[in-house]
Amino acid sequence: MTIQRSVVAVPARLASSRLPDKVLAEIGGKPMIQRVLEQCAKAKGPAAVVLCTDSQRLQQLAKAWGFPVLMTSESCSSGSERIASVADELVARAWGETADQWDQPTHIQRLAATAVINVQGDQPFLEPEVVTAMVDEFNHRDSVPAVVTPVYRLKPDNIHNPAVVKTLLAHDGRALYFSRSAIPHVRDVEPAQWHQHTDYWGHVGMYGFRGDVLAAWDLLPASPLEDLERLEQLRLIEAGHTIATFPVEGTSLSVDTAEQLEQARRMAEA
């Protein structure tokens, strides 16, 4: 089985605990969520870019900008849970169909042959080429992975920043763990010098899901690690799924704090 279709899903809400209404914050004269949707639309490959939200306000704005919207429950606890709740509809859009057209064999085939690219709504400087690369990564391996995500080499000043998610990699590029702490810990060395002893990798907040894996999200057991770190991808790790990674240059700034919002505005003006 190979990936034959792809679709970008952008989960977004207004009730952000750390920075309320952040996706509507203006950056370079545009709301952040509009910048994200427009950057995703520049990627080659995906059949559509779909906003997934519980907000009627965001729904109205996205439609005015020309983007389709799928409404979700207010109770979704993460972006992945939000897009998983409409997985069938997302996959159907990738094929130009509706899910109610499918019989059971077609349903199974469509899910397994579709990549759903989850792009968080707080990445205003997302590079479209990264989205394109994520789709390509599914078919450039010996077997189609369950999940693909990009990583980047961290600069020393971000290694100990809890707002920057770190990724611990195996030799073959599999993600062993994700953390807000610096991993690995370098014993008997001052933390400021850890970068001199090993490479540290940051995680770009994007996930490429095989459709059947995404559709089964609500079947995954509760994850204590996810709750502790507040990192949704740990639910997959703890359940035994393999997350494949690939390196990208630089990083796409995720806006989670007021300081990062100001940084984004400065970048837009530069």
Give the predicted meaning of each segment.
Residues S17, I117, P124, T167, ...:
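Residues that recognize and position ribonucleotide moieties
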Residues V8, V49-L51, V116, V147-V148, ...:
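Hydrophobic/aromatic residues located in beta-strands of well-ordered beta-sheets
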Residues V50, Q56-D136:
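Short phosphate-binding loop-to-helix
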Residues I3-T53:
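N-terminal glycine-rich phosphate-binding loop and ensuing alpha1 helix
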